[in-house]
From Swiss-Prot:
The lineage of its organism: Viruses, Varidnaviria, Bamfordvirae, Nucleocytoviricota, Megaviricetes. PANTHER family: ACID AMIDASE (PTHR28583), N-ACYLETHANOLAMINE-HYDROLYZING ACID AMIDASE (PTHR28583:SF4). This is Uncharacterized protein R632. GO terms for biological process: fatty acid metabolic process. InterPro entries: Acid_ceramidase-like (IPR016699), Acid_ceramidase_N (IPR029130). It holds the Pfam family NAAA-beta. It comes from Acanthamoeba polyphaga mimivirus (APMV).
Amino acid sequence: MKEIVYYDFDLDLNPEIRWVKIFDAFKDKITELKSHLVNLLKPHDSSLKVISMLSGFINPENILHYGEIKYITSKLGMKMYEIIILQLVYEITAACTSAVIDVGDNKLFLRTLDWPLEFLKDFTIGLNIIRANKKIGQTITWIGYVGFLTAWNHKHNYTIAINYRNSNESNQSRLAKIIKNIQRTITLKWPVGYMVRYLIENEKPIEKVIAFTTEVQLISPCYITVYISDGQSFVVTRDCHKTVDIRTDNLIQTNCDFGKNKPNILYSVERRDYVESVIASITTDISPDKLIKTLLKFPVVNEDTIFWVCQFEGKTYSNIV
């Protein structure tokens, strides 16, 4: 395993220069990153042709984080609509495990992030979210992606983690999903990673987090785990247009709905069952290190796992697998 390196991400800087130091740190690997991203886009050539004809799609007024995407586009030598579609592709390829586990009087938060994209391990980074010279939150992400899928807020002590969900609405080809996501983006629905970023960087209190995660229109169905170290954690099951379920117990979430065994994406059922078995074996004298090591075994950590993060008693532990 490899330690995750954190970089300062200053929101007070012009959006077009926020990523400069981070890209500079990876200057010797940018060509490699571009090659991987181009290969990732190849199966979506049809989507790219459609997007290239949608002039309004790259209108700065329609694009959140336009300045950042503009800079990333220039550094990678790619077209802007290619970078934009990458933001959407990531939302329909991630399989993850998130869990909130009672350990005595405390809670442990577990998160693994799984993608069938081995190259992401070399480009996974942490960001210290800075505003007014103060660290207001953190996220684990990768170069080229401007949303947050795993992030935590310091002021209000909560963490948000997103898991991919394959709802009835999303039982269609990947091309159809992407085109649908493009349509929703143009009509200003929220990419879920952008929604999480909005909550974290604007230091929204938990009441706003509950409202946003349950009420806003999203471009993709998902599961949203909100871990509150000193309060009531919860998991929201979302379709694009509505909340399907919200629960405050049994907080183990993989990539199938609570109480169901299908779709069994990347050992979703086995991951859930394994975490349940670990919870059942917890003793009052178990150490955090031992518990984390026990949790981070197959199938929770598997061939597609990119990184993991655990939070316990105010400390955050994380590594690239």
